[in-house]
């Protein structure tokens, strides 16, 4: 899946919380659902959608499933956003250099 699917998945506030929690490592559904204002089945549904979009992957640990972030999909989003940063930083660099050069021309020589 592309960065669009990942961004769509991350637009949901509950899924954003799940991603934040998974930053610390793999977790079972029960731990992920703890303290959320949605039911455990709702969290399971969110995780299925996230898995389908490639945001998380599941590994079996005995009788339970552990969910963990799939950094590949998040890396696609980072690469997409980097294009905007690259353009913005180039503009900032150009503006700073122009301002510096204009300042040098205005200063009286000693």
Regions found by a protein language model. Name each.
Residues 47-48:
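Short, hydrophobic-biased segments on the C-terminal half of alpha helices
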Residues 8, 13-14:
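N-terminal beta1-alpha1 ligand-phosphate binding loop
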Residues 60-66:
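Short, Lys/Arg-rich nucleic-acid/phosphate-binding segment
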